[in-house]
A protein has these predicted regions:
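Helix-start/capping segments and mature chain N-termini
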Residues: 1-74, 78-249
Length: 249
């Protein structure tokens, strides 16, 4: 069942340690880091907000150099404070299974009620997320739900709902990560003429959705629920096709 009927509760508040640093994960295809400027902008915003410093110049060139010559890999860049600006930077390349990108299989969601969202920054300290994933168990994706009943995000992706061909996603209110691919999905929706809204979504909206989509930097777009509405199915296909075009052949 793509969306499990069960709900779990996780009582611990999100309290990661920002001193461990922040990071970005980029998809590299044919030597090109996808959405590099957006990833760097988000990383730079977090470094300024958390540590009061700027990223050193030339990081974009360093990422491009690291990606050069690689057909399909994952690139991770970390910024770690160490007492004096600028932060320590690390760039790492790792193999990536092609099946990870735009996978055709549906994933299963399990709703987990939490006290708070994880917040605006992509922190290296993922212990809170790790505990939630352990609670949910293997083979499922925990979908975080606020005490108010509003949908937040999964532990690794932003969430979109399609109903009647109309796209909706939770707003950027400081409780969820401002996803890079989330922004790309909204841009593609506008370009393709797919109505898209950023607004509070609840479990009722989740139950009524024709299609549930998850957006992330490596998978790009995953489906967690697909029902019979033709308009929503077509919209999901068009969005996936647009993201595939971003990656290239």
């Amino acid at each position: 069942m793509p969306v499990s009927g069960s709900q779990l509760a996780f009582d611990a508040a999100s309290a990661p340690d920002p001193a461990r640093g922040v990071f970005e994960t980029l998809l590299v295809r044919d030597g090109r880091p996808l959405q590099a400027s957006r990833h760097l902008a988000r990383l730079g915003a977090s470094v300024r907000a958390l540590y009061g410093v700027a990223l050193p110049p030339g990081l974009g060139v360093a990422l491009a150099d690291a990606a050069a010559g690689h057909a399909l890999v994952r690139l991770r860049v970390e910024a770690v404070p160490h007492g004096a600006p600028p932060p320590l930077l690390g760039v790492e390349i790792a193999p990536l299974d092609p099946a990870v990108v735009l996978p055709p299989a549906e994933v299963t969601l399990v709703c987990v009620r939490v006290k708070t969202g994880a917040g605006w920054h992509k922190l290296i300290d993922r212990s809170w997320f790790d505990q939630i994933e352990a609670l949910a168990g293997g083979g499922v994706r925990p979908l975080l739900v606020a005490r108010s009943g509003e949908l937040l995000e999964t532990t690794r992706a932003n969430v979109f709902l399609l109903r009647g061909g109309v796209l909706a996603t939770p707003p950027l209110d400081g409780s969820i990560l401002p996803g890079v691919v989330r922004a790309a999905v909204l841009e593609h929706a506008r370009r393709l003429g797919i109505a898209a809204h950023e607004l509070p979504l609840t479990l009722k909206h989740l139950r009524e959705a024709d299609v549930v989509l998850l957006s992330g930097s490596l998978a790009l777009l995953e489906r967690a629920q697909v029902r019979g509405d033709r308009r929503s199915a077509e919209a999901a296909d068009r969005l996936a096709g647009a993201l595939a075009g971003d990656v290239g052949p």
